[in-house]
Amino acid sequence: MAYNNKNYLEKIKQAVEVTKAHYEPGRKTVAILTTGGTIAGSGEIGKETGYVPGALSAEELIASVPQLSESVNIRAVEICSVNSDDITGEIWIHMARTINELAQDDEIAGFVVTHGTDTLEESAYFLDLTVKTDKPVVLTGAMRPATSLSADGAMSLYQAVCAAADKKSVGLGVLCVFSDQIFSARAVGKSSTYQVTAISGGETGCLGVVRNDEVFYYQAPLRRHTTASEFDVSAISRLPKVEILYFYVDADPAIVEFAAARSDG
């Protein structure tokens, strides 16, 4: 599915919608940015495969978890609606700039990004390097579509909002919430194509957990991120094209020449 973002400011203006039905002055506001993926997927009731990723709009996804608006105000921002395999550098830039723009709003306490799991770790790390705010930015997703038996997306989204609204999450960089655990964007990875515990923190483990609406942290990331990062996407519309090549026994050296002729580095 193609992504088109010719007019950034107009896209921002059209994308931001405040959910007014449960809006209460004085409560924290969490902006939920949706990009599609399994968490917004829809298919045959009870089936875990053969679904359409990104079928639910931002409003439909948020409405499917009514508990979200019980303690915080929700602002829905639809970035795109794609399978995470179709996420592009242009979408990354749009996402980072949207967060940076909205972070200037004092009413917004934090952000949640719903995302497909195949490239979630890449998007999380990109945002960790390019978002310019100490406000919590939390990515989450699902391994099963909303129409599946024992779907995991609703709880992940709810716990991500809990983490984004918690003041203890401020200044920790971009985070990922899955299966009750909170991971650093720098360490998070996907280790399974079907298990609901597929997202993990690798050798570093998790930073903390979400239990009964409460957020607990046990450690903090020490590497530079967000406001301390030197990367700035405010004035660019595309990323340099850099290929990553994997080599193996008897690999054809011509692969390097092919990639070099079609990339910036």
What are these regions (language model features)?
Residues 2-102:
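ATP/NTP phosphate-donor binding region
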Residues 105-120, 263-265:
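Short acidic, glycine-rich surface-loop motifs adjacent to enzyme active sites
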Residues 33-35, 113-115, 138-141, 173-179, ...:
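Short beta-strand segments
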Residues 139-212:
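Internal gly/pro-rich beta-alpha loop/helix module
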Residues 34-40, 115-121, 181-183:
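Gly/Ser/Thr-rich loops at beta-strand to alpha-helix junctions
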Residues 27-29, 33-34, 57-68, 184-265:
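Accessory alpha-helical/coil subdomains and C-terminal extensions
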Residues 41-42, 118-124, 153-157:
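Short glycine/serine/threonine-rich phosphate/pyrophosphate-binding segments
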Residues 113-135:
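Short Gly/Thr/Asp-enriched flexible loops that form oxyanion-binding sites at enzyme active sites
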